[in-house]
């Protein structure tokens, strides 16, 4: 594994570790979840950009160093729609990996366009 790949994998592991500690109160709005995720990343000293445009009409909730994109969904998202959305994001060159943060588990592929996909709920 080359150094760049190892660094991306390390960054992904660090971000996942920070996000797995989130415990969202019931009845949060989606932007409240955005705030919880951003606070968790800040506590772990992981910078992120919010509402990042990747392409025309294609904006992801957060992007962390190394091109790790985070999409946040409240409730039980529709699997077909979320996979289509993640597929659009994974097709963008600036994204190296994706993390889906949801309140409930959604079955998503492990990889899309060769990029790792993780789900945190």
Q: What is the role of each PLM region?
A:
Residues 2-53:
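Acidic-basic catalytic patches of nuclease active cores, encompassing PD-(D/E)XK
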Residues 17, 39, 84-91:
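Surface-exposed alpha-helical segments enriched in charged/polar residues
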Residues 37, 48, 70, 99-100:
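Hydrophobic beta-strand residues in large extracellular and virion-surface proteins
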Residues 42-46, 64-68, 92-96, 114-115:
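Short glycine/proline-enriched coil/turn segments at helix->beta-strand junctions
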Residues 53-65:
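Catalytic centers of nucleases
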Residues 55-56, 82-85:
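Amphipathic coiled-coil/heptad-repeat helices and related helical stalk/stem segments
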Residues 62-76, 89:
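Conserved catalytic cores of phosphodiester-cleaving nucleases, focusing on short active-site segments
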Residues 76-81, 90-121:
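Nucleic-acid nuclease catalytic cores
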């Amino acid at each position: 594994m080359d150094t760049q790949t190892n660094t991306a994998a390390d960054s992904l592991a660090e971000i996942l570790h920070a996000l797995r500690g989130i415990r969202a109160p019931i009845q949060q709005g989606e932007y409240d979840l955005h705030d919880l995720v951003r606070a968790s990343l800040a506590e772990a000293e992981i910078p992120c950009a919010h509402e990042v445009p990747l392409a025309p009409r294609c904006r992801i909730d957060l992007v962390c160093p190394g091109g790790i994109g985070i999409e946040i969904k409240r409730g039980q998202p529709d699997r077909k729609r979320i996979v289509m959305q993640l597929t659009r994001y994974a097709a963008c060159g600036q994204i190296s990996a994706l993390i889906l943060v949801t309140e409930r588990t959604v079955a998503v592929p492990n990889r899309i366009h060769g990029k790792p996909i993780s789900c945190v709920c």
